Regions:
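Extracellular/periplasmic carbohydrate-active domains that bind, remodel
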Residues: 1-413
């Protein structure tokens, strides 16, 4: 018979000051498959915790799982990440099936504690620092000191469900699912400090059968990303994202990165607010993205100052200056209020069969627009801004791509 485990029985204090790592880990280790470790009625401050299959970690509405603001309280979990190096996490699982995180409570990660806020914020080469106003400076990237690199990290797990949680202030990628199968996120809110770099909402790498629904992601970096960064030889596929709200200083929705292979994805009924980019589909040498569709996306883009990728585009579909390939992209029945046109950019036709149908565009420049008007941002494929190529209609820039179809409709009044 499954049982409910109270970490206080293992010595947890839950006063928000005492470090409860050891007591929480004892409670988690004591849980048999089917058991629930329930955090209730307090703030449980902790460093790194290891999870295992068959476990439910329930954080009740009156409870907070608080990540320690001291990096010394975290440890390497034993996974080498190809981009971030050794993985240092708040919660992690390496292998294990039937894992659930839930409960209606809050995970507070204390991300700002790992940043240097006195650092002169990064200013891109295109901008004269003397012209930067205080309002613009507050949009720029802060500096990293030393941080947990993958706050919630699951690798090689199956049948994972995360639902009814609020996660605050991640210092880096909030959720990472690497080499996982059958993952569902439902009614999850992630709210991160927008000046912290790399604080993605949820990042799926080399995973399959993914469902993300009814979630809110407010992030400094990508809200939702699907790549193969942790395992370039694999495929990330069979993805549905629906009924979500997103805001990002980078891309709200990203498919592909460098040599990643991503396929078979649907995004629908998503609202994007004041993001550097809305939709981002990228492939570089050895990478490919195919058969992805976006339906009923309502988006507002805004150019944010600093080193953020993107310059107010409603979408960027890009395999420029590479041997990567992108095909079968459909963007349908979407409304875009943006600062720059959309971009479809390839080399010698390696981007093809892109359909933009029944979409409306309205371009309204913001305060940073004069720095970047008329230039494409193809980062990370191409490091420098490029002059705009010819336009398909007034609202889409196309270069080096084949079979790009555009059918606009007037914006809604």
């Amino acid at each position: 018979m499954s049982k409910i485990i109270d970490p206080r029985s293992f010595g947890a204090v839950a006063d928000g000051r005492t470090l409860d790592t050891a007591a929480l880990q004892r409670a988690l280790d004591a849980a048999a498959p089917g058991d629930t470790v329930r955090l209730a009625g307090g703030t449980f401050r902790t460093g790194t915790l290891g999870l295992h299959g068959g476990l439910t970690l329930e954080i009740a509405p009156d409870a907070v799982l608080e990540g320690s603001p001291d990096i010394a309280d975290y440890r390497d979990c034993g996974f080498h990440h190809l981009e971030m190096g050794q993985t240092v996490s708040l919660l992690y699982a390496l292998g294990g099936d039937d894992l659930t995180l839930c409960g209606g409570g809050t995970i507070q990660m204390n991300g700002p504690a790992f940043m240097d806020w006195d650092f002169a914020h990064y200013c891109p080469r295109e901008v004269d620092p003397a012209t930067v106003t205080p309002e613009v400076r507050e949009q720029m990237v802060c500096a990293i000191v030393k941080r947990p690199t993958q706050p919630i990290f699951l690798d090689s797990c199956r049948h994972v469900r995360v639902h009814d949680l609020t996660v605050l202030d991640a210092p880096c990628w909030t959720f990472t699912f690497s080499n996982c199968e059958d993952v569902a996120l439902e009614r999850v809110t992630v709210e991160n400090h927008r000046q912290i770099p790399n604080c993605d909402g949820v990042h799926f790498s080399a995973s399959r059968r993914i469902r993300v629904s009814d979630c809110t992601f407010l992030c400094g970096d990508d809200c939702f990303a699907a790549t193969c960064i942790t395992n370039p030889a694999a495929v990330c596929e069979d993805i549905v994202v629906e009924r979500c709200r997103m805001q990002s200083r980078s891309a709200a929705i990203r498919f592909g990165h460098l040599d990643s292979t991503v396929r078979n994805a649907v995004v629908r009924d998503v609202r994007v607010e004041r993001s550097n980019r809305c939709i981002c589909v990228f492939a570089k040498d050895g990478g490919s993205v195919r058969d992805v569709s976006f339906e009923r996306v309502r988006a507002e883009t805004k150019i944010h100052a600093g080193g953020w990728w993107g310059k107010g585009e409603p979408f960027v579909v890009c395999a420029a200056e590479s041997t990567g390939e992108i095909s079968g992209v459909a963007i349908r029945d979407c409304d875009f209020l943006c600062e720059n046109p959309g971009v479809v950019a390839g080399t010698n036709g390696n981007v093809r069969d892109v359909r933009i149908e029944d979409c409306s565009f309205r371009i309204e420049p913001g305060i940073t627009h004069p720095y970047f008007v008329g230039k494409m941002d193809l980062q990370p494929n191409v490091p420098q801004l490029r002059p705009a190529p010819w336009c398909a209609g007034d609202h889409v820039w196309v270069s080096g791509a084949e079979r790009v179809a555009l059918r606009e409709r007037p914006p809604a009044v």
